[in-house]
Amino acid sequence: GPSSCKADEEPCEYHADCCNCCLSGICAPSTNWILPGCSTSSFFKI
């Protein structure tokens, strides 16, 4: 859940590291209204 996510803009390697681990390797804010905690941009790793 979100409680286990790193803060936004923190480095990430896997999707589990943060709510949205994007291809840049940085945690991003949640941007998906339908699936909170998921981003509409690509994950670095699922």
Curated annotation (Swiss-Prot):
Expression by tissue: Expressed by the venom duct.
Pfam families linked to this entry: Toxin_19
Primary location group: secreted
The UniProt record lists the keyword ATP-binding: no
Gene Ontology CC terms: extracellular region
InterPro entries named in the record: Conotoxin-I_CS (IPR013141), Toxin_19 (IPR012624)
PTM annotation (4-hydroxyproline): residues: 2, 11, 29
GO molecular function, one term: toxin activity
Chain positions found as D-phenylalanine: 44
Keywords on record: Bromination, D-amino acid, Disulfide bond, Hydroxylation, Ion channel impairing toxin, Neurotoxin, Secreted, Toxin, Voltage-gated sodium channel impairing toxin
Compartments, as annotated in UniProt: Secreted
Modified residue annotations for 6'-bromotryptophan: 33
Disulfide bonds: 5-19, 12-22, 18-27, 21-38
Record flagged with keyword Secreted: yes
Homology family: Belongs to the conotoxin I1 superfamily.
Entry note about domains: The cysteine framework is XI (C-C-CC-CC-C-C).
Annotated function: Iota-conotoxins bind to voltage-gated sodium channels (Nav) and act as agonists by shifting the voltage-dependence of activation to more hyperpolarized levels. Produces general excitatory symptoms.
Protein name according to UniProt: Iota-conotoxin-like Fi11.8
